[in-house]
Amino acid sequence: MLQGKNAMKPIAADRRTLASLTNSKLNKSQQEAAKIILENTDRVMGLQGYAGTGKTYMLQEVEKIAHYKGYNLTGLAPTGKAVRALKDANIKARTLASFLMQYDGVAAGRGTDKGRFDMKQEYKRRLLVVDESSMIATRDMQKFLTIADQLNIRVL
């Protein structure tokens, strides 16, 4: 994970774009979290908060700004229920298991240079949002982070 430190360009760092957060319905804590996500240059970020504090709601605002800047958010979650919650918030989502199955060859070190290049291009301007990460088995999280590292994927 250290090699992912300062490895990415920020999604949005200009004052004008970030000022739109103050005009949103987000509270101050949500605005600050959104600003950190949008300005961050690390490949892997963490977001922690109690249930019902508006993390997913805040991500809707992040998604709007990211989309405006040419980025997409994709949610990954360990359960179908968590995937549905992300989709209900208008965040494209799928199960982590389906993602791991699709990119199993990357985690195992198989594949061609062209295939890896194509996959990197697919995720070049995308933020993967992992919801309910505390429910993910350690082995699956390790596999996921290996894939994210190999494909240079930005993760929250």
Q: What would you call each of these model-derived segments?
A:
Residues 1-156:
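Conserved ATP-binding/catalytic motifs of P-loop helicase motor domains
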